[in-house]
Structures are given as C-alpha cells and as structure tokens.
Amino acid sequence: MGNRINIKKYKFLHWIYNLIHYKSLSHNKAAYKKYAIHRPVIASISSRNFPDKESKAWLDKGHSRELVPHKAGFSHFPDTIRRQLLTWSDNGYIILESYFDETATSCILGEIERLVNRHKLHPAPDNNKLMFANRLSAPIREITYDQRLTDLLSFLLDKEVVPFQTINFVHGSNQRAHSDSIHMTTYPLGYLIAVWIALEDTNPDNGPLFYYPGSHRLPYLLNSDFNEGTTLLTVGKKNYGDYEDRIAALIREKELKKEVFLAKKGDILIWHANLIHGGLPVRDPGLTRKSMVIHYYAKDVIKYHEITERPSLLK
C-alpha cells in the first residue's frame, strides 16, 4: 500500500476552503485591523504571526480577589458565584450545581437524538464527538445564549462573548489532559472560555471529567513548543500525541494535583482557556456519560486554531 499522503497538512487547501467560507471569517477582518496584523483573513495563522504570547485578560494580569469586587455587576451575582469569582485567578474554574433544570437538559438530549436519527449529526470517525449541534438546532442555540450564563462569562473576560461551537458526548471522552487553547486560540491570548454541562450523573465508571486547578497560570503551550516542521506550505510534522505528551510531562514537572468532577445532571463547570483538563478512562463501556461543551470566544479578538494554523469560521 505504501505510505499514505496526508493532504490535510497542505496549507493551500485550507486557503481554498477559507475562501469558499469567506463570510464566516468577517469577524477577523476588524480584529486584524485592531491588532495591526497585516495578513489576508483566508491565510494560515498561528502564534508565530503575533508579537507576543501573553494573556491580556484582566483576571490573568491582576488577581480576581482584588479586582472583581470593584467591577460593575459583581454585586448582582448570587453569593455562590461571587465566592468563586474571587478565586478565579487561583483556580481557573467555577462549578455551579443544578444550573440547568430538567427541562433544559431534556431539551438538549431530545434535540441531539432528533439530529442523530435524522442523520444531520454524525460522530467524528475517531471519537464520539457530535460537533456543532448549535448550528442545527434552534433550542440548543438558544441555550448557548442563556443570558445569566453569557453575563457571567462576559464578566470573567471583561468582553462580550459569542458561542463558537458545541460538542456533545454520549460516552466519556477518554481524552488525555490538554488545554483548549491549542485547539481554539485567540490573540491576545486568554479570550476563550468553556462551559461543560452534565446531561446525566457522572460516576467513577463512566469516565468523568478531570482538571488541574491553577494550571491555567502556566505558560500557554503552542506550536513552537512541540510542533516542529511548519513551512510556508505545510503545517508541522508532529501529531497531536506529541502535544499530549508535552502536557503530561508538564503535569509531572509541576506536580499538578488532579481533581475529578463527579457531576450531577444539570451541573456545569466553567473553565479558563488554559486550564488543563480531560476525561478519565471509561471503566464500563456499557455506561453513557451524556454531556455538552460550549466554547465561547470574546467578540473583538482574533480567533483561530493554533494546532492546524487555521482561522476560526463563525457562522
């Protein structure tokens, strides 16, 4: 059979695809101008094209305990949220129990079942991710714009947020530790935020979510740290496993402590763009772990995908 050619590594194919979807890149045109990035919006983009690799988010530059009590809107949040806002700079996450009620979680589950049965939503071939249901379902899209939630996320980033994607899981992800910012990246760094929603109870056997408190304070691990071989026409030669190995080494080096989120249906976990997290191995393959992740970008920043060097398409 010989060696198979990986055509996805060729950037010119990305450029053609981006040109076809040019309207979905309009969000970056104003941001490129704002940050003086002189580059076509259809072109490949990575951290190499920016002048720095530092987060500019206000709660990364300063400490939440000192800053958030003085910000307009802080007093409007419930006490359970205010307490966790104060520790955001230390922890990099917020847990809200029973945030979504039975009506909301059943709505999401029903919509996913409907889309799968109608063959409008298909799991990725190498995992069980169901991508972008928010683009296919008005009820799910409405949930991504939940006003209480977007108000909180906008407060955390000090910028208006916009939902980029949803990922639905039927089973546990079995995903190794990673930071979302290798997949969905911003310039300046720090302007992505994620919300994980438990659509059923989790337990030690169905592959619960894990995370490393405080890991968001580590330097961002970007292509230049592991993805050697990028050229003008091709992306780097290393694969995603190399990135995961670097994260694993970093966890050992820094002696990070793992926390496991044994969530109940309706609970949510909000995490920082750079918080290291993943999914524990599924001990019982017969069990489901239904959940949905929503990734949000801040509205007025450059949005792209570091690992593939492609600009984000917002539809």
List where the protein language model places each region.
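Short hydrophobic-aromatic micro-motifs
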Residues: 95-96, 195-197, 269-271
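Catalytic core of Fe(II)/2-oxoglutarate
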Residues: 245-315
